[in-house]
Regions:
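Alpha-helical repeat scaffolds in large eukaryotic proteins
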Residues: 73-76, 80, 98, 102, ...
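Extended amphipathic alpha-helical interaction segments
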Residues: 106-269, 273
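Short, solvent-exposed mixed-charge patches
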Residues: 1-2, 316-318
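Charged, amphipathic alpha-helical oligomerization/scaffolding segments
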Residues: 6-9, 13-16, 20, 67-74, ...
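N-terminal Sec/ER secretory leader and immediately downstream segment
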Residues: 2-116, 256-257, 261-277, 281-298
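Residue-identity detector for threonine
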Residues: 20, 34, 40, 65, ...
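Generic alpha-helical secondary structure signal
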Residues: 79, 180-183, 235, 287, ...
């Protein structure tokens, strides 16, 4: 099915975005540390302390964020593989995923959802790799996809885009502010401008250069903020697209019936409860074949999704 194949084709772009943004979590911390103005012994100590903190906290945080993002990357790739019946030997390391998610500051329910996504798709592909299960994969995992995508995107936005990168801008301001103030002090000490015209011109040129360098460095960080925001938007758009596919494949219903949950549980290590579910007979009959109408709707939302996320991925890769 072309819709899900296109969904899967974008997994490579999603993987690049995940690697780029996750790596910059540590890099941003390190850059902030090196922006510490080194005019005193104490400032050198502060810079060293910052770098130590980056190694202790943000290096593993960066690595675990990439692991967290890989849950969605692998899932998106797996959906594409199901659509094209291309078994590429997908074998996510569930223990590594569980351990990595456990070390991130995200909601416990989201951690559980991430592990459940990886667990479900692994069991599905290993035990019953059939294109017919494409609808099963999308319908069964959507609730966890929504929960996990929301928490992951919120985490990246709050901890990276709005925290680390803002701190980096603050450090750049303070760094250049220190050296610009040193130039200003020297300018103020020039008592006779006519006798010190050359010194005045030299100092003014230094100040202008420092201010231009500051703006250039801040512009670099602003571009990284745009890339981070693009990744956040891509995650949210992917989840939105997945929900649309789920509703197309589930007769425009949000909830799953007991019959559907039983089918989903076939691929879950931990089975879900069947209580309080819709048990209407016509809803319980779950046709796993994709109808012509469903295919037409899926193609439409797929085109909308690709048109929406392609510029976002281009922003990250530029």
């Amino acid at each position: 099915m072309s819709a899900a194949k296109s969904f899967g084709d974008l997994s490579q772009s999603l993987a690049i975005a995940n690697e780029t943004i996750s790596a910059d979590i540590y890099a941003s911390c390190a850059r902030s540390a090196t922006w510490e103005a080194l005019g005193t012994q104490q400032s050198r100590i502060n810079s060293k302390d910052r770098l130590d903190k980056c190694d202790e906290i943000y290096l593993p945080n960066s690595q675990n964020t990439e692991i967290a993002g890989s849950v969605l990357v692998n899932y998106v790739a797996a959906v594409g593989n199901l659509a094209t019946e291309n078994d590429n030997g997908f074998t996510p390391q569930l223990n590594k995923i569980s351990d990595g998610l456990g070390k991130l500051d995200i909601d416990e329910n989201a951690r559980t959802a991430g592990v459940k996504i990886a667990d479900f798709i692994t069991n599905l592909l290993v035990t019953d790799f059939r294109r017919d299960n494409l609808k099963v994969a999308i319908v069964c995992t959507d609730q966890d996809i929504q929960k996990y995508s929301t928490e992951l995107s919120d985490f990246i936005e709050s901890s990276y885009v709005k925290s680390l990168l803002n701190e980096e801008i603050t450090q750049i301001h303070e760094n250049y502010g220190f050296y610009i103030s040193e130039v200003n002090i020297r300018l103020l000490k020039l008592s006779n401008l006519e006798d010190n015209l050359q010194d005045f011109s030299t100092l003014q040129a230094q100040q202008t250069l420092l201010e231009a360098e500051e703006r250039a460095e801040i512009t670099k960080v602003i571009e990284r903020k745009k890339q981070g925001s693009a990744y956040v938007a891509a995650i949210r758009s992917t989840a939105e697209f997945h929900r649309k596919l789920k509703r197309i494949f589930n007769k425009d219903r949000e909830e799953l019936s007991s019959d559907q949950i039983q089918k989903c549980n076939k691929y879950r290590s931990k089975k879900e409860s069947l209580s309080f579910q819709n048990t209407e007979k016509e809803y319980d009959v779950w046709n796993q074949e994709i109808t012509t109408s469903e295919l037409k709707q899926a193609k439409k939302v797929t085109k909308e999704y690709i048109d929406k996320v392609t510029p976002l991925f281009n922003e990250i890769q530029d």
